[in-house]
Amino acid sequence: GRFVAIVGPSGSGKSTLLHLIGGLDTATEGSIKVDGSDIMKFSENEMSEFHRKKIGFVFQKFNLLPMLNVRENIVLPLTLGGDPVDNEYIDELIQFLGLKQREKHLPGELSGGQQQRVSIGRALATKAEVLLADEPTGNLDQNTSYEIMEYFRNLNKKYGKTIIMITHDMNLAQNADDIIQIVDGRIV
């Protein structure tokens, strides 16, 4: 697993590329290979399985359900998918993300950084191999942004997760193993 940052000006195609990799958008030509499989050829069921098992998404907006506590928000993809919850893994994930003391708190009782860590936990609850992060620090202050980068680095190094992150902040991008720059829809 690698930690890759994709950078470029607004409107350059960064988020579009991430959405194509994650199968949220469909390309008009070519192929998109993730983990050796051409996702452009997936049936609807295969794409659904791909989203549930292989890919975790972290967005700029936390998208947490306000009536669910930290743990319930993290296990939500498993609950919705009818998948069993590996409580030992979820406990380890909550501990790793520094949320053990906040496990029973609702999103409104958490700081922005804590909410983003919950969304990272939710993205990883299914044991996804690839984490796609679209401006994950866009709503956070600089110190909290660097804390989130530290979690990403640790996820990559300790757990071997592949992380593809969109950012406009070159300082944050420097935390990645590789930096890809996009200008006008082209990798430069």
Where are these regions (language model features)?
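Conserved switch/coupling elements of ABC/ABC-like ATPase nucleotide-binding domains
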Residues: 184-188
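ABC family nucleotide-binding domain
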Residues: 1-175, 179-181
